[in-house]
Regions:
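Flexible, polar/acidic helix-loop-strand segments at domain edges
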Residues: 1
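Conserved short alpha-helical segments that host acidic/polar catalytic motifs at enzyme active sites
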Residues: 4-248, 253-298
Length: 298
């Protein structure tokens, strides 16, 4: 992968040649991997995110990226993302250049839509409330409708992925909400589909799972740091302890005070639905989803 194909954050470069002007959602953009980490002691998290993404490589081989920020200093985002495998896009020098104790990472796989650098994640949105970093796994069935609604109110889209629709929706709701987690809950009320999200707003790491529980997301802990990951195998890679799964419909907020949960959108167990392909195809055999071993389920 050439350096020109990569995207180095401090100046986020959008190559308009890579951006489709027509909206073509990634209809089968479902097997991606997300990873987020917040180290309360101020240690850089890029290296741990790298290894977490490496463990999730089976979930996406087209592109990958890491975005980090420092909660103890100015809200400046360092990001690097590129086309290819995790170990192809990142080397030690690039990882060490990403300074920050909170961050999100993503590996992408799609069978429809554009496989270009502009569609690589994480996404970084700068808006009136600050900066939002987001990684998304899943697919929205009402992405066209939401995109049109946002576009008519002034949103300018730079990608062809439904993930950007979610990011703009969260940013818009944040302007009218007291907290970032409240904005995520409001945004989720408008989303239709299967998804898991990892969002970083100033000094908060937020994880969310669709109300049906179609896409997985779990919580881990290592020393004085918390982790959110698509699969438990990513926690094992960085010697983190598995805490629990994020419940379907739950929004988990991690900040200096620990973890808090919003279960406003949680559904009854009999109304929930899991993706069978996570157990028989997508996930690594050594992962666990909602207390079930992927290996045993196969």
């Amino acid at each position: 992968v050439s350096e020109r194909e990569n995207l180095f954050s401090r100046e986020i470069i959008m190559n308009q040649r890579d951006v489709s002007m027509s909206w073509e959602p990634d209809a089968l953009h479902e097997e991606c991997g997300v990873f987020g980490m917040y180290d309360f002691d101020g240690n850089d998290v890029a290296s741990s995110i790298y290894y977490g993404l490496f463990a999730l490589q089976h979930r996406g081989q087209e592109s990958c990226g890491i975005a980090v920020s420092d909660t103890f200093g100015p809200r400046k985002v360092d990001m690097y993302k590129g086309m290819g495998l995790v170990n192809e896009v990142f080397d030690q020098e690039k990882i060490q250049s990403l300074k920050g104790n909170i961050g999100v990472g993503h590996v992408r796989y799609s069978t429809a839509g554009d496989s270009v650098i502009s569609n690589a994640q994480p996404l970084v949105i700068n808006y009136v409330k600050g900066t939002l970093m987001m990684a998304h796994n899943g697919n929205l069935i009402n992405a066209n409708e939401l995109r049109d609604e946002l576009a008519y109110t002034g949103a300018i889209f730079q990608t062809t992925i439904d993930s950007e629709v979610i990011a703009y929706l969260v940013a818009r709701e944040r302007i009218q909400s007291k907290t970032a987690e409240e904005a995520v809950v409001k945004a989720m009320k408008k989303l239709r589909g299967a998804y898991s999200l990892v969002v970083s707003s100033p000094r908060k790491l937020i994880g969310a799972r669709d109300p049906y529980g179609f896409k997985p997301l779990c919580i881990g802990k290592r020393d004085n740091a918390y982790i959110l990951a698509s699969e438990s195998c990513a926690l094992d890679t960085i010697d983190a302890e598995f805490v629990r799964d994020v419940e379907p419909g739950e929004v988990v907020t991690i900040d200096a005070n620990g973890i808090k949960s919003d279960k406003t959108l949680c559904m009854k167990p009999e109304e929930q639905a899991r993706c069978i392909f996570e157990y028989i195809y997508f996930a690594r055999p050594d992962s666990y989803f909602d207390g079930v071993s992927v290996y045993d389920s196969r």
